[in-house]
């Protein structure tokens, strides 16, 4: 293994873990790694998806400690995000997922309840979901709105959002989803998924090289690639 490090994605995020010498706490909880660092032949695995998400919140002045958070979706992105939110001191996490045999909400809830100190619950996503009053942060961790279905918006009640809530999308393509456009039209504070993508990539580069990359250049490259 002569590379300084690599990124990996599905289906290798889980399979590669057995070959690593050390795995970060969050990656162990998530059950997947997306980056590997080679230090003198010792392989270290981490998951920077959730960390990139947290950096996106921080860049908007959002501190998750003590906050009540609703996560739309229970897949891989939701798992990484929920673990980082729990480790950062979120007060309450509500996982909203479709009921059925493929529902990953219960297994994610079990991880949060047994391996972190966060208060958490699941809600079945049946029909139009209403965001509970008192929610601080809403996260769209679904793929609804991802290219090419650029006009789609997750089925939740936009009127249940208030101006003191913050909404974070995880979809990077398009860089401004139909959901983000509608939220901005309504005056709801929000952030696109591009920040999460750029931040996790920047973290990976820094882990491999010890240098912080210019994220402005990375944003520009992403916009050009998706234009």
Task: Please provide the spans of the model-predicted regions.
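Phosphate/diphosphate ligand-binding glycine-rich loop within oxidoreductases
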Residues: 1-60
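Short helix-loop-beta connector
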Residues: 39, 62-68, 161-163
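Glycine-rich adenosine-cofactor-binding loop
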Residues: 47-50, 66-87, 97, 102
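Conserved S-adenosyl-L-methionine
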Residues: 87-92, 185-189
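NAD(P)-binding Rossmann-fold cofactor-contacting core
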Residues: 90-116
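Rossmann-like adenosine-cofactor binding region
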Residues: 117-190
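Adenosine-phosphate binding glycine-rich loop
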Residues: 166, 170-227
């Amino acid at each position: 293994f002569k590379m300084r490090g690599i990124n990996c994605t599905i289906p290798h995020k889980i399979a590669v873990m057995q070959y690593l010498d050390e795995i970060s706490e969050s990656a162990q909880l998530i059950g997947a790694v997306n980056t590997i660092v080679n230090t003198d032949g010792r392989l270290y695995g981490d998951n920077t998806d959730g960390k990139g998400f947290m950096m996106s919140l921080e860049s908007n002045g959002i501190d998750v400690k003590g906050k009540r958070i609703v996560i739309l979706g229970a897949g891989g992105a939701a798992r990484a995000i929920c673990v980082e939110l729990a480790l950062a001191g979120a007060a309450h996490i509500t996982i909203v997922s479709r009921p059925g045999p493929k529902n990953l909400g219960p297994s994610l809830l079990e991880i949060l309840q047994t391996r972190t100190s966060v208060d958490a619950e699941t809600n079945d996503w049946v029909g139009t979901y209403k965001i509970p009053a008192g929610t601080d942060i809403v996260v769209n961790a679904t793929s609804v709105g991802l290219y090419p279905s650029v006009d789609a918006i997750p089925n939740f009640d936009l009127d249940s959002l208030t101006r003191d809530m913050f909404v974070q999308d995880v979809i990077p393509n398009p860089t401004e989803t139909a959901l983000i456009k509608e939220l901005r039209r309504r005056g709801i504070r929000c952030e696109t998924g591009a920040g999460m993508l750029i931040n996790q990539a920047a973290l990976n580069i820094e882990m491999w090289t010890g240098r912080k990359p210019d994220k402005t250049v990375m944003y520009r490259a992403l916009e050009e690639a998706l234009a």
